[in-house]
Amino acid sequence: MVTTTSPVKAESRNLSFYYSSGHKALKGITMPLYEKRITALIGPSGCGKSTFLRCFNRMHDLYPGNKYDGQIVMYPDNTNILDNGVDPIEVRMRISMVFQKPNPFPKSIYENVAYGLRVRGERNKRVVDDKVEEALKGAALWDEVKDRLHDLAFNLSGGQQQRLCIARALATDPEIMLFDEPTSALDPIATANIEELMSELRNKLTILVVTHNMQQAARVSDYTAYMYLGELIEYDDTDKIFTNPSRKETEDYITGKFG
């Protein structure tokens, strides 16, 4: 049983997902995301972790024929973000995403962070300047790049590029951030920096992270969900999942007997 005093920020309700091929990748998942907490998704490759994550900002809309069944409700406005009348662009302003590999745009450091603000329609240069600085500080990158904001983003190291992508996601003031294996392409030092940053971001954001690294899930998350073959097998406090899981399937995966 999950123990928390945090309100629910968003939740999936009986969520299923079908790829255009007809494959049912998610099977009736109901799961909360608690406000200003980190939830980790674990499970073997192909279990549906990333598919589930990408439902939250409607990334699947980019490919014709994909189909959602069920709801994802955001609070406090009780908006089902999967409704046809809800603009996916607006959803992605509220729910930002950081991908597995750093994917900076072929632009300057400054323009990478300013991009989302411009898409949103912000034209005031002072406002954009302030938000770029705020986002870079929020991603713990400002001190490293403040004197070369107009350098190409590709000149940054891999770890710096990933923090730049986090800054880009932060610039539009999202309520939720999605991380899809954000450290899998990084070295141990850069990984530690991203994990520390995620812990700091938890003070103002709700975070959902997919990771194949169970030690990482144990280190950074408050809650952990174990998925298998498109189903949610177990969801609980992270300490409970890793020390005393309720389901044998979870225990077998955690202890390396499976997966």
Curated annotation (Swiss-Prot):
The keyword Transmembrane does not apply. GO terms for biological process: phosphate ion transmembrane transport. GO terms for molecular function: ATP binding; ATP hydrolysis activity; ATPase-coupled phosphate ion transmembrane transporter activity. GO terms for cellular component: plasma membrane. Pfam families: ABC_tran (PF00005). Keywords: ATP-binding, Cell inner membrane, Cell membrane, Membrane, Nucleotide-binding, Phosphate transport, Translocase, Transport. It is found in: Cell inner membrane. Its EC number is 7.3.2.1. Its main location: membrane. It is an enzyme of class 7 (translocase). It catalyses: phosphate(out) + ATP + H2O = ADP + 2 phosphate(in) + H(+). ATP binds at residues 43-50. Belongs to the ABC transporter superfamily. Phosphate importer (TC 3.A.1.7) family. The complex is composed of two ATP-binding proteins (PstB), two transmembrane proteins (PstC and PstA) and a solute-binding protein (PstS). Part of the ABC transporter complex PstSACB involved in phosphate import. Responsible for energy coupling to the transport system. This is Phosphate import ATP-binding protein PstB. It comes from Methylobacillus flagellatus (strain ATCC 51484 / DSM 6875 / VKM B-1610 / KT). The lineage of its organism: Bacteria, Pseudomonadati, Pseudomonadota, Betaproteobacteria, Nitrosomonadales.
